[in-house]
A protein has these predicted regions:
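PAS-associated C-terminal cap
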Residues: 1-21, 130-147
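PAS-family sensory domain signal
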Residues: 15-66, 109-111, 154, 161-186
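Hydrophobic pocket-lining residues within nucleotide cofactor-binding pockets
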Residues: 35, 117, 134
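Short, ordered coil/turn segments that flank beta-strands lining enzyme active or ligand-binding pockets
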Residues: 35-36, 102-103, 120-121, 167
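PAS/Per-ARNT-Sim sensory domains
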Residues: 56-83, 91-95, 142
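Per-ARNT-Sim (PAS) sensory domains and their PAS-associated C-terminal
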Residues: 72-76, 85-115, 121-125
């Protein structure tokens, strides 16, 4: 089949409705920010992540981060957006932030992805991308870190000699008491 025929066929298959279905299946929201005018458009999924509705004017997270982004993440977010838009990266923008839901004041983790469209002078004129709710992943990572810390605290206070070796019989973990017994530096 000639390539031009495949291209036309794909254009009929990949309709906006199907793209929206795919974004919904991936639990991703889509945004378009016109940098020149400051106007931003969000899909319903972005608005849901933000705790906003179509009836209200949702803030632009890029120009008003203080309204939706966690205080501890605002400077990092603004710096990373600026660095990306200034052309210091050749890969798409990816920033993980905590976002406040406007309707409940609860927080969720969101990865903001973006790709800039640039004019002939390489100045950014538009940023297009998706938001991904990563709260489940971040929660799991935090729980795993807490479990790891608890595990290390528990084994450090057991008076017995405890260590772990890999298949090559190399030490991969030893508690301080065991390290002292073996005469090696404590981990």
């Amino acid at each position: 089949m000639p390539p031009s025929r495949n291209r036309h066929s794909a254009q009929r298959v990949f309709t906006w409705d199907k793209i929206k279905m795919a974004l919904a299946a991936a639990e991703e929201g889509f945004y378009i920010w016109n940098i020149k005018t400051g106007v931003i458009h969000y899909t319903d999924r972005c608005l849901t992540m933000m705790g906003a509705s179509r009836k209200e004017k949702a803030p632009n997270i890029f120009t008003q981060p203080e309204l939706t982004i966690h205080e501890e993440d605002q400077a990092f977010f603004s710096q990373e957006v600026r660095r990306y838009l200034d052309g210091h990266s050749h890969v798409p923008m990816r920033i993980e932030i905590r976002m406040k839901k406007l309707n409940s004041k609860s927080w969720s983790w969101v990865r903001v992805n973006g790709l800039a469209r640039r004019d002939k002078q390489r100045r950014p004129v538009m940023l297009v991308g998706v938001w991904v709710n990563i709260t489940r992943r971040k929660t799991a990572e935090l729980r795993a870190a807490e479990d790891r810390d608890l595990f290390h605290t528990l084994i450090e206070h057991i008076p017995d000699s405890i260590y772990f070796k890999n298949r090559e019989s190399r030490f991969v973990l030893a508690i301080t008491a065991t390290a002292n017994e073996l005469g090696v530096p404590a981990p």
